[in-house]
Amino acid sequence: MAGVLTANTAEAQAMHSLRELMFGKHTDSSHDGSHMPIVAHFVSARGEGFVLDESQAAPLLRFDGDDEVFQLTAKPGANGDITFRNDVGEPVLKATRLGGMILFSGAHEDVGDPAAVTGQAPAFTPDRLTLTELWLEMAKSQLRVSHACNHRIDINANKDNIDEGIPNETIINLFAESVSVTTDALIQVASQADSRHALDKLHEVDLIEGRPPSAHIENGVLIVKLDPSRGAWGGHPSSKRIMNVVMTGLDDETRR
């Protein structure tokens, strides 16, 4: 228990330190020139834009032009820097002790690219879907994945065993986000000549309740575990994590 408390305290301190390093005291107003917004848009030196949302329980990031929202984990370094990692343990952002921000992405993920705030951005909010709309999205996604893979792949969702205390809207949002992320991951694998063979034996995707959020393949079925208690973005594995599972057969639980 002491170890858990220590880890949680360190992460909370990291988030507090990040805000102080970069922005001083956060404000929801963009009219105060001495403070930066708690939800901010950044652009890297090479022109890659993204939004960092610190208004939630955990930091969230979305790249411009991408629908996926990534939940990050903040880890303080010995030199006072704070590194944000994704759910496969890779660094995505670094806040330096001098107040700078470095983005690790794409061709520059090893050396990083300095980024600057360009202004305030709206906080991330999940789409409001009904259960019927969720099933329609699943049907559309199943067609897209099957077409990309050149064979039928069913997408199923089982939400029967989820804690009754969790709002139905939260559950639907989580399943909808997971369907979208999983679909994008499989289509991306299928688009790569050197990896699409990994989908040859895949015939089904099952979305189920489980902790921690993870993914694995069993007898041609991609099983994606979702944790509604972590919300719409933290409760499912990212597209990158799912791609790694499909291509290697292994799930990296570095963060979870």
Segment roles from a protein language model:
Residues K140-R256:
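A eukaryote-biased signal for long
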Residues A115, Q120-K159:
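Charged, amphipathic alpha-helical linkers/stalks
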Residues N8-A12:
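Sec/Tat signal peptide C-region and signal peptidase I cleavage site
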Residues M1-V4:
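Bacterial N-terminal signal peptides
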